[in-house]
């Protein structure tokens, strides 16, 4: 539907990259992405669509954890900065139209939620109930770790505009916990 000469669709949105770390099968694990798999997916779409169709380029959306936490290294301020810049350069140097999700340009990270009560996403609650309470296949502690890594709530926290109260997002208490790093990432 997207070949340039067909004049049907002008761009392809493909989500294969969003499952590179096993998210399509089971996002509630410690599984990390394979750099080899990541490069193969990106290359396949770049080569396959070259002079054939136009691609959309993105690392994040409202249903994905923050890309710098997912594909980068946030273990130190220096690693965080270099990872965020590397991901931005990678995205912008490919053929296609880059889409930047709110906060990605700042290098916003996943939120260190500590409790089930910190979450708002229904998928997260349902998965917790299924895996921890019904199946008893995952411990409470492991599930909290998986949720910190993969919950959609990571992408749904308020934009970190500045280092003022509530990151300058609102004078009122936000609907979900602010990432405590808003003091330095804004």
Task: Locate each region found by the language model.
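Active-site and adjacent substrate-binding regions of carbohydrate-active enzymes
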Residues: 1-186
């Amino acid at each position: 539907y997207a070949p340039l000469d067909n004049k049907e669709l002008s761009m392809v949105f493909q989500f294969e990259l969003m499952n590179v770390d096993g998210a399509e099968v089971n996002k509630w694990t410690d599984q990390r992405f394979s750099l080899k798999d990541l490069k193969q997916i990106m290359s396949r779409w770049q080569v396959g669509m070259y002079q054939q169709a136009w691609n959309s380029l993105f690392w994040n959306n409202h249903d994905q954890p923050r890309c710098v936490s997912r594909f980068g290294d946030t273990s130190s301020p220096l690693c965080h900065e270099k990872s965020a810049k590397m991901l931005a350069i990678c995205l912008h140097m490919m053929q296609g139209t880059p889409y930047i999700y709110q906060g990605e340009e700042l290098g916003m990270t996943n939120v260190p939620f500590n409790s089930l009560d910190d979450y708002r996403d229904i998928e997260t609650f349902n998965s917790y109930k299924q895996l921890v309470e019904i199946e008893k296949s995952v411990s409470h502690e492991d599930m909290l770790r998986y949720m910190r890594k993969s919950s959609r709530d990571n992408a749904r926290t308020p934009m970190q505009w500045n280092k003022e109260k509530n990151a300058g997002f609102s004078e009122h208490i936000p609907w979900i916990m602010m990432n405590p790093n808003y003091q330095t990432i804004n």
